[in-house]
Amino acid sequence: VDATWTVPHFEKMLYDNGQIVEYLANLWSANQPNPIFQRAITGTVQWLQREMTAPEGYFYASQDADNFIDSQALEPEEGDFYAWDYQELAELLTADELTQLQSVFYITATGNFDGKNVLQRHQGGVLSTEIEEILTKLFVVRYGTSPENLLTFPPAINNEEAKNKHWAGRIPPVTDTKMIVAWNSLMISGLARAYAIFSTPMYWTLATQATQFILDHQWQENRLHRLNYQGKPTTLAQSEDYAFLIKALLDLQTANPTENYWLEKVIAIQEEFDQFFWSVELGGYYNNSLDNSQDLLIRERSYQDNATPSANGIAIANLVRLAGLTDNLDYLAQAEQALTAFSYVLKQSPQACPSLLVALDHYRFGNTVRTQSELLNTLCPQYLPVTRYQITENLPNRAIAIVCQGLSCLEPAINQEQLMNQLQSLTLSE
């Protein structure tokens, strides 16, 4: 992205898109129901389904920033798949359509990116039907057919295939088709959260298919493996693979708490994670497993967030969530030890480790709502990031839910207003 946020970096990473889906879904649920957020989520998931989902159900890793203009080009050019020459737009569209498009997007004869136009909105808001129809015309130029006729777009897996295969539209960027557990898990979390809010069946289908692929295919000799190339798992998993996968499973459980399938998987994977990565002496998780670090001078325990969250930040929050869902306080003790291990960093450089701060929020304010399944349709779409849900039929007379924090519980809530007030009071009490 440039300094003015006009031109994006055109490379599309799975981990970026998974995080933005979750973030926008949370924004929507936090009393910010801006239609542009929902449109961005919808468009991202459509792209994911169309271009980044393998027939087996997992998600590809990335798409290149550049692509070939034609089969005779020696080198690919950045952003050509997405950018528009002014003369090209003038030939594709009627004069009225071009005028309408210019009223919504910055479009000039000189362009804003190497002489071409990257379509940037003048302002937000809902696009009109007329503008959507014009954008569909441009989609057809890119892909050779309309969106409704293009459910899947097979990837170009290398430059040779990109240049030599017959494409109905423009030559697409090359797609890295390997499966990475950590990156898939970030997208699964985003889809799970979006499903909890919008109840779109496709979000759940995509999330659970990818998850099931990992559960069915990424274990060899009882160990999780990080990568999959064309159906073959390889490379022992790192701490982020375990942490993000466990979070994804917990997010699926949160989106559909009526069954414990995902929670049962979490418990087993957490045990494996602890066995090979947990620092008994210091607390926290090493980046590499015990049996895959013989050549390392130092076994590091990363805490900084970068393009993806820190494994330790996510893992500690997972432990707190697990404690609330299972009533196993050993998980809570682990979380406390890990937070203590990173306490100096939290005090001195909090801006470097926002995921650890989120984990601290879970530890201090995390709560569990015990309720009947009928109330979940109301609770799950709410922005309650440190709340877990347990299904129970054993509620006192007239009660709809019981809110518990740690070993103590509040008085049974008899209506939704009382329940929401209790949850708010817990997060503001300290």
Residues of each region from the PLM?
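Glycan-recognition and catalytic cores of secretory/periplasmic carbohydrate-active enzymes
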Residues: 1-430
